């Protein structure tokens, strides 16, 4: 079993494609590319952690519940088991579409193909504790955090962890091996160089 990580997919409409200048004609092309890129590297034995913002639901875009559910069902087309860490877009959906009931949303999404939906999580990679979170301000101190939320704007490295947003890996998921490599590189270079712009 291998673990994979991504964040900030914003499936569902073209707003993020346009705002972030993602190199896709429309959200359908983007969704197909993401599903294809995931399925090229991950099997049904693997787990894909999506660290928030699977769907685009914000002050501009308010799809109805049926449209949200259809967007969540994209998970059924992916080979690996998909675990969604709640992002700020999903938090809005919990509030607006599930009467503020996280467990109600979680149950619905599991019935639509997700392995699980969690608020945050803790795993180990290569024996190292790793905290999974959407928004980096909610990070856990004293461990490496994998996060999203900031898209490509804050870069890959932070002193407290790594940004696994899809925009930072050519719209492919980061593998467990990628994370091990990036953490070694972070410690050997970024953490030692005050001028590397990761602080």
Regions found by a protein language model. Give the residues of each.
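Extreme N-terminal starter segment of soluble prokaryotic enzymes
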Residues: 1-4
